[in-house]
Every structure is written in C-alpha cells, then in structure tokens.
Amino acid sequence: MTYAYTYDVPIDAGIYARIKDGLGPERPPGLIAHLAWSTESGLRYVDVWRSKDDHEAFAENRLHPVVHPILQEMLGFVPPEPTHTVLDVIDAWTDRHPA
C-alpha cells in the first residue's frame, strides 16, 4: 500500500546537500517520489513510498546512519525524529510507478 508523508526540518539547503551526498546516487528501493523545498523555518519534504516498510527500512539502514552524524556535528546532539504528517494517497502517477 502506498505510504506518503510530509514533514518540516530545521535545516538549510547546505545541510540537505551534505545529507544527499552521504546517501549517494542510488535510488532507495520503494521510493516513488521525494520533494524538498525551502520554508521560512527550514525545509519541507514530501515523500511517497511503495510501502511503509520500504520507508522504514531506508530510514533505519541508510538515512539515519548518514543524518545522525551530520546533526551531531552541526547541533551537538541528535534531535528527535520530526513529526510526520501521513497523507491519504489516492493516486501516485509517475513515470515509474502506477498506483
């Protein structure tokens, strides 16, 4: 079942670029779409995944090992995971994924 969410993070485009560099170019299994844009307080993301399990595997095995050291370096601590607002997806129409 498609899993999508949005959340805000208090980082700038420079920190985001460091995170993306650390993740490397390989597309995460199950990722349908990822959007990030600037807000007044940092960045906002929208992610769409094939399933919640795909997202959780990526977060635990790939994202957190990259993000946590960067946040520790920049902030002196690792803040709690931001609150995710889960989206009630009706359709995900992309060039790679029929809903």
Language model features with spans:
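Short S/T/G/P-rich N-terminal loop/turn motif that feeds into the first structured element of a domain
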Residues: 1-68, 72-99
